[in-house]
């Protein structure tokens, strides 16, 4: 498969290879290199999301390839109801992808968006990662689940008894997921990390992002008026310029 990018009448053709690790479909973007970025997408996204394509277009012109893959219940895996998109399953998948990268590359970096960043924090704290790039990251999943429980008037005891509850806004809460989050706090992240966060992000409070950035010495850029989902022409233009300055 090939994707053709057009810019100022100059064509850039990027080769994309499809492969699979167990039940995880992967895309490998660009010509063979010694360095690679692993991309972990966010909720309701997939391995070919527009923000991933933009990122791939930038880094494959440099010294990197990109590996992107579908999280459980996303992309090519959206119809698999046996293997759910829970933190423990995603950590398992991220570790498989990391092991693949270790076998094939000399240097590994990561790009992650939204809840994908949270899964990266859970999975890769002890890995040798040269650079981390986070777009609209979730860094405290417990706060998000607590908020959903409060909005739906669900207590921790009720969730424990019922094991899973479908909220009024369609999100299913799982006690084993919640327990995993509680038992695996983010206490270590000694990576060179750049974060792009929108000031109007309604998923993770700005104070939480600021505290995380200060605690782990991250380079934080706050885009005024930006949302959790970067999708407008202006937002994507800023995102692209930001990437070109940090990669």
Residue ranges with predicted function:
Residues 34-42:
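Short beta-strand element of the alpha/beta-hydrolase
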Residues 110-112, 135:
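Short beta-strand immediately N-terminal to the catalytic nucleophile in serine-hydrolase-like folds
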